[in-house]
Amino acid sequence: MVFLLCFFLVADVSYGINGDCELPKVVGPCRARFPRYYYNSSSKRCEKFIYGGCGGNANNFHTLEECEKVCGVRSRDSPKEN
């Protein structure tokens, strides 16, 4: 039983990124212009984008800090603009 507990703890730590952070950026079909952040799995950093206001997914954060905290990213430079 202890072995299983250790196995799952190691597996959880080694996986690292929250599954929501691996979702693609979705601007959505609506035409609002909300500045948001998403985790870009290619660049491995949080980047700014303009969210339309509807039809998004969980990879959509109000602040850079929230994105970095949830997705386990350390801030490097200012975010890329998209």
Curated annotation (Swiss-Prot):
Kindly list the places in or outside the cell where this protein is found, as annotated in its UniProt entry. Secreted; Nematocyst
Q: Which GO terms describe its molecular function?
A: serine-type endopeptidase inhibitor activity
Disulfide connectivity for this sequence is: C21-C71, C30-C54, C46-C67
**Site keyed Reactive bond: positions:** R31, A32
The UniProt entry, under InterPro entries, shows: Kunitz_BPTI, Kunitz_BPTI_sf, Prtase_inh_Kunz-CS, TFPI/VKTCI-like
Q: Which family does it belong to?
A: Belongs to the venom Kunitz-type family. Sea anemone type 2 potassium channel toxin subfamily.
Please state what the protein is called.
KappaPI-actitoxin-Avd3e
User: What lineage does the source organism belong to?
Assistant: Eukaryota, Metazoa, Cnidaria, Anthozoa, Hexacorallia
